[in-house]
């Protein structure tokens, strides 16, 4: 499993390596940012207010940008991958005053903060792709639709070494874009790969009420064509995964056998009854692995469109997931992969955010954690699902098995097993790239 995660990271690295033109763009100052400049640049692009009291006025001004929206994609100039390529530096080593925000008690880097930075970076990359030179502000409202996959190459990050992010648009539909992002950390004189991330972003109109067209993408090399093809494969994989969801289809024969065998293993051998259940040795009931949290969504956590920042939601979910894995495994867990985070509904400022995390699958040293996110307004007590997060952690020691007691928990177990197995089954391309051991 660990080798599989590393393979995914080195595979993506191999894809970008032949396309040296993408990295050459870093010589352009307009494509290089300090981490503090990213959010400021986004506010400038959309004309967002810096004060909460002015947010209504700012949103009213954005309505005037509706005339700049294209009627069709054909009316938009095509862009290249180089047009959207940017680099962002997080100088933890050379600017120690930045460390406090990113520091863990174990003297490593907070991965939740990295998720926030990746979310902001992905949005900025898409605005670079759809840049309108004749307009000061963009008429598009670009938001994160899906975190397709994040794969880690390293277990630990040093808070005393500089970090670099890079990324660009790798696939474009009519109103959506796939963004490839990479993170590196300085070791000696070189930046070593830390993670690869694939996000899917969607473009909305200036009022964030309906879809908007994005600039088409021109492919300039065989490597870029392969990146685009991988985007097509990713889209197909997501459709296939969704169509076979346990919310739509019954488990496979193999999965049904797995659940039945687990059920039989929990029957009390002293009685001949389906009602008497006992927990096998070195095991935990799934219902006992839960942790929950509640947050009030204050204006401080808003995004440039005055909804709650998606990176904040990911950070809170990750931190609860990490705590759940730590509590379950009894030792410090390390994040291995993040996948299939669908942003189903925006979270309004002032909402109550309910997070519920539980271990749904384990194998060896690995813990699959599912975090369910719900919101409720202060006026309306109805809860609505906004996100479901899937995190794969690796513990320092072997962890107990987790056993479901109900049919619903059995489905969560199988869903967790599917997400875990997907880590070792990356999308394969025609060309055979050399994979580091």
From Swiss-Prot:
Its EC number is 3.1.2.-, 3.1.2.2. Strongly inhibited by NADH and CoA. Residues 1-21 form a transit peptide. InterPro entries: HOTDOG_ACOT (IPR033120), HotDog_dom_sf (IPR029069). Residues 84-207, 287-399 form the HotDog ACOT-type domain. CDD domains: BFIT_BACH (cd03442). It is found in: Mitochondrion; Mitochondrion matrix; Mitochondrion inner membrane. It comes from the Eukaryota. Pathway: Lipid metabolism; fatty acid metabolism. Keywords: Acetylation, Hydrolase, Membrane, Mitochondrion, Mitochondrion inner membrane, Repeat, Serine esterase, Transit peptide. Coiled coil: none annotated. Belongs to the acyl coenzyme A hydrolase family. Interacts with NYAP1, NYAP2 and MYO16. Mitochondrial acyl-CoA thioesterase. Catalyzes the hydrolysis of acyl-CoAs into free fatty acids and coenzyme A (CoA), regulating their respective intracellular levels. Regulates both mitochondrial lipid and amino acid metabolism. This is Acyl-coenzyme A thioesterase 9, mitochondrial. It comes from Bos taurus (Bovine). The lineage of its organism: Eukaryota, Metazoa, Chordata, Craniata, Vertebrata.
